Amino acid sequence: MPTEYFERRERALLGDRFDALYAAPQDTAARGVTVSALRAAPEQFAAQADFPVEPSPFCKAGFVVQDPAFKPGRHPYHHAGVFYSQEPSASSAAPLLGVRPGMRVLDTCAAPGGKSSQLAAALGGQGLLVSNEFVAARAEVLRSNLERMGVPNAVVLNEDTGRIAAALPEFFDRVLVDAPCSGEGMFRKEAVAVTQHCEALVKQCAALGAQILDNAAACLAPGGEMIYSTCTFAPEEDEGQVAAFLQRHPEFTLADVFGNVDYSFGSPGEANRTGGLPLDVNKVRRIWPCQGGEGHFIARLVKAGTPRALPAPGTYTAEEELWLAAAAEQSKKQKGSKGGKPAKAPDARSARRESSRALREAVQGRSARSRDAGAGEATPAQSLAAWQEFARQYFPALADRPAVVHGGSVLLPVPFPQTGLHVLRAGVFVGSVQKGRFVPEHHLFTAFGALCTHREA
């Protein structure tokens, strides 16, 4: 049930439309899955799914789960990164950003990772995705989910957006701000959203959202685009928030929210929710419960200037080459924890046996404790040599990619400047030398499994 404050406010704003707009077509919260293009095309998934789904109106890769008792998070496709379990309307915002391969993309408030996984799919392994989460525990969940989804080109940060703006001014071609909000679209999904809801929370979230928007604006390059979204209905966090932002930032214009896609959904914004400030509410979008989702608000903002030219597919800019070189130089300064003790070279038979065992462990996944147990047995040079030998046998397409050693493990880095930001992951940890053999990481297979030359058809 909605709170007394919420219902009083919304009835005053909507009048006799209140009951119709908030009348959801189902008794329980809508459930859906969003298919990752890194794994499968939506049509392929729809043809092979062994549970009932129907296409979502909010996203071409989205599907509504028709059985309310079905739990997508327990399905093998979930664990394989084929889809992300996501409330249907939550999948609406990311595609509207118009992300293309080669872009630099920032997701400012990314946990648990659903929208970041959509952005990663749009990048198709080309370019850079920086997924940030301020809360440390949620940032770890974000990192884990992006690994499960097989994202190869992500940097996961645990940072304040103000520090990101200071470190990376006008760096990104696209920015998504799915702002922390009062969660009025979560009332049916999470009981805590109702119990903690009050007018003070709305005002607090609106102030925080304004701060994050200002920081995001500083991160966005000239000619870049930004999507602002919430899962709430509060005017201060939606139309009023966007209208106030445009007053503070004349370098931005409000663009048609559907300018990057060939479909539409939901309803226009509401003119009586702008706080008296000018705003073309036909350019923003609301999703009401009666439209099949739990609720969302979306606006698209464009920064003045000429967009950055994107690098050719599969290439790096000169600047990005320097960042990779700096990462390699930093790697050379590390020392093996055993003082450079040579790793024991196994004979051919044991090498094959250990490699097969390592592959099984990688596919099944290992705990951080298991992963770290043998790290540091080899010097960085020995670790890189072991990786290259392993890659030539199992992943020849990766053998010549830049690789560095970080914390005893081999990392395929993404081009990212050294900023002093709190980085949880910057690329793909492919494995480490343990007990004289190279032990691959699970992320290697989720990110690059299709490149493995020793796999079942």
Stretch-by-stretch model annotation:
Residues 1-48, 294-297, 304-457:
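Polybasic, low-complexity RNA-engagement segments
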Residues 174, 248, 276, 280-316:
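Core SAM-dependent methyltransferase catalytic element
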Residues 103-104, 128, 174, 223-225, ...:
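Short glycine-centered segments of the SAM/dcSAM-binding site in methyltransferase folds
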Residues 1-171, 203-208, 255-281, 285-287, ...:
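Glycine-rich nucleotide cofactor-binding entry segment
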Residues 128, 151, 173-174, 179, ...:
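S-adenosyl-L-methionine-dependent methyltransferase catalytic core, i.e., the SAM/SAH-binding region
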Residues 245:
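Conserved catalytic/ligand-binding micro-motifs in nucleotide and anionic cofactor chemistry
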Residues 137, 174-214, 227, 231-239, ...:
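Mobile active-site "lid"/loop adjacent to the S-adenosyl-L-methionine
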Residues 123-124, 220-222:
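Helix-to-beta-strand junctions that scaffold the AdoMet/dcAdoMet cofactor pocket
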